[in-house]
Curated annotation (Swiss-Prot):
Record has Glycosyltransferase as a keyword: yes
GO molecular function, one term: UDP-glycosyltransferase activity
Enzyme class: transferase
Originating organism: Phaeomoniella chlamydospora (Phaeoacremonium chlamydosporum)
Origin superkingdom: Eukaryota
Organism lineage: Eukaryota, Fungi, Dikarya, Ascomycota, Pezizomycotina
Protein name as it appears in the record: UDP-glycosyltransferase 2
Recorded family membership: Belongs to the UDP-glycosyltransferase family.
Length: 455
């Protein structure tokens, strides 16, 4: 008997934080165009955002259904802890707390799909662990395939890299590997409390053998781990798992392009009669403009360049900065789609949002980076390692630091040349096609296995 070639139902599962939901929304819209039926599982606050794109919505249960629009409210201890291991430990603990509700939510959608006689492939983002218990042996409905889409730097332990969060470059020399092994073991020792919490939680769900690290298991557990970057942006690992694939960056579909009109001064951007520098602090760490936006505007005010700053959460500088005098060479907007803005940029100054860095390099634009919250320490370290960026390696930059780095990048062609090399590598990838191909491969393999069992 020949295995069925019908397309599987695709369940998209995202933690309810914008950058996570937005990426899977792009994927979901593309899959619907390709003829897949989809269900989108995330927090209630994103129902309208998901349904506006024409995607069927299913709400997460219990504490997994939080309001990720306010990160500080969702994770109240985050801002009270210093960047680095304390914050990562707190975040790990919070993610583990949500796993039972995530697991229950995924099982509910799988039950709904199975009741219709359909097979499902589950796609989840890096921070969502709802399908992992099943992959680890917990009882319940097993999907035809599982895919995790990597939207952060890879959190893998490796003999060739220092532990995630250290910000150190890779080193595969004998001395470097000795450093890496020692540092990795130290981090595992520090994470013993959260690891014990992870182990207890997984066993409560019926998992018999629990992996020895939560973040590592995020990569190694699914059938496929599809990393949203090019291979040249991620550290090389001689011991990388076989399920890992690099698929390039996502291009936004029509449904995902911003509805914000372009500003009245957009002609000045298109005119491009002088170097254009873009500065932004992204969608999460954008509550203190003194971290990067203000130092950048101060640093560049006397240079013969044009600066565009996007504030994301407001239309103008507010709070204790509302009296700040905007320099004459600065144009301010709440939001401009980076896919449009970066076409005209010569340099991007940013705090290191993973998607923003991918978009900049995908357009061949070099960067100056400063940020140490969330995963930004690792993102910025990789960007500098790639050769297309300068990493200031701080949370709050000074005007002098920014000016020196901006002038260096604009005056030294090696940064632009390297960014253009990365652009070519991004252009050779088709992330959405790769995702569809992996869905089909997993569904076909599952169907063939089922046929063999029935013979």
């Amino acid at each position: 008997m020949i295995a069925s070639t019908a397309k599987p139902h695709v369940i998209l599962a995202a933690v309810p934080i914008y950058g996570h939901v937005e990426k899977l929304r792009i994927i979901g819209c593309d899959l619907q165009k390709r003829g897949y039926a989809v269900t989108f599982l995330t927090g209630t606050v994103w129902r309208e955002f998901v349904e506006h794109a024409g995607l069927p919505f299913f709400a997460l249960k219990a504490n997994a259904d939080f309001d990720g629009r306010d990160f500080a409210k969702a994770f109240p201890m985050w801002d009270k802890l210093p960047p680095g291991p304390p914050r990562f430990g707190y975040l790990r603990h919070s993610l583990i707390d949500q796993m039972p509700a995530q697991h229950e939510s995924v099982q509910a959608v799988l039950e709904d799909v199975a009741a219709r006689g359909l097979k499902a492939v589950v796609i989840q983002d890096t921070a969502f662990f709802g399908v992992n218990p099943i992959q680890m042996g917990a009882p319940g409905i097993t999907p035809a395939g599982t895919i995790t889409v990597g939207i952060t730097p890879l959190p893998l332990f490796s003999i060739d890299t220092a532990p995630f969060g250290s910000g150190l470059p890779p080193d595969s020399s004998p001395e470097g590997r000795a450093r890496n092994i020692a540092a990795n073991e130290k981090i595992k020792a520090v994470a013993q409390i959260s690891q014990a919490h992870f182990t207890q939680t997984m066993k409560s769900l019926g998992v018999k053998t629990v992996p020895d690290d939560l973040l590592n298991s995020a990569v190694t557990t699914p059938d496929r781990f599809l990393q949203l970057c090019i291979e040249s942006f991620e550290y090389p690992r001689s011991d990388a798992p076989s399920n890992l694939r690099y698929i390039g960056a996502l291009a936004p579909g029509d449904e995902n392009k911003s509805q914000h009109p372009l500003p009245d001064w957009w002609d000045l951007v298109i005119k491009h009669d002088k170097p254009l520098v873009v500065v932004s602090q992204g969608t999460l760490s954008n509550h203190n403009y003194k971290d990067l936006i203000i130092p950048t505007l101060e640093a560049l005010k006397d240079l013969d360049i044009r600066v565009v700053t996007t504030l994301v959460r407001t239309d103008s500088l507010d709070g204790d900065l509302q009296d700040f005098q905007i320099p004459s060479n600065v144009l301010v907007a709440k939001f401009i789609p980076f896919e449009e803005l970066f076409k005209h940029a010569d340099l991007v100054v940013n705090n290191g949002g993973y998607g923003t860095v991918q978009t900049a390099f995908g357009h061949g634009v070099p960067m100056v980076l400063a940020g140490q919250t969330e995963d930004k320490t690792e993102t910025n370290a990789r960007a500098a390692w790639s050769g297309a960026a300068i990493n200031l390696a701080c949370q709050t930059a000074t005007a002098e630091q920014v000016r020196d780095a901006v002038e260096k990048v604009l005056n030294d062609p090696k940064y632009k040349n390297r960014a253009m090399e990365l652009k070519k590598e991004y252009e050779a990838c088709d992330a959405l096609q790769s995702i569809a191909d992996n869905i089909d491969e997993l569904a076909a393999a599952a169907a063939a296995e089922e046929e063999d069992e029935n013979e």
